[in-house]
Amino acid sequence: MGRKDHTSLRWGYSTGACAAALAVACWQSLRTGTPPAVVPVLFGDGKERLLPMRPPAPGRMAEMVKDGGDDPDCTHGAVLFARLSACAPDDARPEDHRLDAGAAVLILRAVEGIGRCTRQGLDCPPGKWAVTGGPRRLLVENLARAGMTDGCWLLELGVENGAELARHTLNPRLGVEGGISILGSTGLVRPYSHAAYVETVRLCVRARQRSGGREMVFCTGGRTQAGARRQLPHWPESAFVCIGDFIADSLGIAARHRMQEVVVACMAGKLCKYAAGFANTHAHQVEQDMALLRRQVQACLPGETALHEALHHSASVREALLSIPEAGRQPVLHG
């Protein structure tokens, strides 16, 4: 999309914005008989942007490739497609969404690669296609702008290889089966977004709460998550969530959702940063507090003067821990 933030990373657009663009492209194609090359979409920030289409394959009225900008989401480059046709209100199936667009009625149906919600705690009811509230609003607003003012219409959306893409998302753990979700409150994708990461944690905790769970395991990465699962083999999959560097945000979310027990699985360097009270533990945000670690070692192992001196030459928490006899590490880490 061309927009860049202060880190010079390129913004993109969400699957929800793609759905709105495809719907408008289908509407224009019905009106003119020609698939448009670009489609104007009004985003949640109140700005209009032009999204490119590509020639649709047979059986499709509109088709496009999702551009996620410099965000690492697995849906970047995914092919989305749609069809639009007149229908009757009672053509809606139980899993379809029925949307009111002024005097018009839009029945929203997934035909390939979009999941179906099976649990509480998500932004669409159980049993419905996984198209959340933001995209549903974008759809009706943009179709109204394009001239859809009456009648009943069936919009069929699909994502090529969506079921495979979903394996690389949280959908299987959140109870979304069969494909990806159509997401995006504003339609914009901020690259490597702090807000997006924290929102993912919030969704996982909320889903856990609404399924009756009262405990979470916050893991800072893949290795710590694997280690935590070995230590807690009887805890359910839905209890384990990767939080990256956002310890303070994640603990706040757990408190607001009344979690009764939270286990934090992390490497020693991040543990030291937690002890120092840092809200964000990324290496670019804050350095390891070696002085704090030395004070902890002196308090837990007061007679080890040679060790105290050696720690002054340690460049990292990991290196320092290797200097501590194995029997003394547990008191230092848990003291």
Regions found by a protein language model. Give the residues of each.
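A structural signal for small-residue-enriched, beta-sheet-centric alpha/beta enzyme cores
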Residues: 2, 10-16, 174-180, 185-334
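Generic N-terminal targeting/processing segments that precede catalytic cores or assembly contacts
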Residues: 1-168, 172-174
